[in-house]
């Protein structure tokens, strides 16, 4: 099992290219199930979750080509993948595939829309909370689906096809919004979704579906109106830059000091994050090619800032762990409140192993900033927690070994290579 070794204390200097957003690529790939024609997606990152979803889609009969070449067995190393679901060969999504990634459950929407039936295992993924699929299932019922759950599988049927309806999400859910949009685009009649997620990744999906012939209005807002169409066409869409990756590297620069350009990062997707990082003392300049970051830790100390996670455009839960790592070296006390997931502080114990001083009280972590962190062996517990340990290790004295980095490979493309090119002492160890 791979691990990553880091010797801290080096400033970061250079250019970090920001990859396509995994959280945007996954629903776009699943949308290929909605059309017989080819959906071409540019800027897809090379990640374990992408590879897994390719296998899942292939299980349903979706062919794919990388820059015009078929590849049914290996993870791709290219920016463009062409997906063609000319015929859905099965509506069955088995446990051995779906259990590895929660987003794979989203195939239930397109399968119901196109085949009027889906038999999908309940999902897996990072163990950071229950993330119930109840909102998705209740929403699909509103569109006319008959749903039963048996032996860990959801069996959904709609013999006469889905019908437009009005549905209000009890709580903002990105995954639920993705599924309901994809289910409703070819439903008979009008669907109105209230309290919908308005993350940039949702907007990316809406724009893609409209390019395929859907009729969706309200993009970027919490109310989406969908006029069902009979069929969707193929299209070519670019995956948006990964705002979570960009925010992660911005926090790394804030932690170590240095001078880094985040190439292709979209600052409009990170408005609150950048404002908060400026309050910590990071110098940020928006340029045509991306986001330019500077920090001289001898001149500007890391200032403590309180944050509370929330649905977009609030501070993203996917950057909470990374920001906590930054706050471990702040000149004072900060408070971090998590409102999205109920179990997303598993990184606290590992950060404390590096010398951090963090105390938990329910959904709030109090971080007592310390001048120095000390390298030590630590264990990644989930995707975002794992990268928070990397950020802390970059500033810690001595060597840190981050174990179970397969979590990192699910969401960060060539992380150690990007950091090493900016001067970090970091390497992957394969046992």
From Swiss-Prot:
Gene Ontology MF, one: UDP-N-acetylglucosamine 1-carboxyvinyltransferase activity
Domain of life, per lineage: Bacteria
Catalytic activity: phosphoenolpyruvate + UDP-N-acetyl-alpha-D-glucosamine = UDP-N-acetyl-3-O-(1-carboxyvinyl)-alpha-D-glucosamine + phosphate
Enzyme class: transferase
Pfam short name (any one): EPSP_synthase
Subcellular location: Cytoplasm
Binding of phosphoenolpyruvate, residues: 22-23
EC number: 2.5.1.7
Matches recorded under InterPro entries: Enolpyruvate_Tfrase_dom (IPR001986), Enolpyruvate_Tfrase_sf (IPR036968), MurA_subfamily (IPR050068), RNA3'P_cycl/enolpyr_Trfase_a/b (IPR013792), UDP_GlcNAc_COvinyl_MurA (IPR005750)
Gene Ontology CC terms: cytoplasm
Pathway(s) the chain acts in: Cell wall biogenesis; peptidoglycan biosynthesis
Keywords, ordered alphabetically: Cell cycle, Cell division, Cell shape, Cell wall biogenesis/degradation, Cytoplasm, Peptidoglycan synthesis, Pyruvate, Transferase
GO BP: cell division; cell wall organization; peptidoglycan biosynthetic process; regulation of cell shape; UDP-N-acetylgalactosamine biosynthetic process
Residues carrying 2-(S-cysteinyl)pyruvic acid O-phosphothioketal: 126
Record function comment: Cell wall formation. Adds enolpyruvyl to UDP-N-acetylglucosamine.
Protein family according to the UniProt entry: Belongs to the EPSP synthase family. MurA subfamily.
Name this polypeptide is given: UDP-N-acetylglucosamine 1-carboxyvinyltransferase
Name of the encoding gene: murA
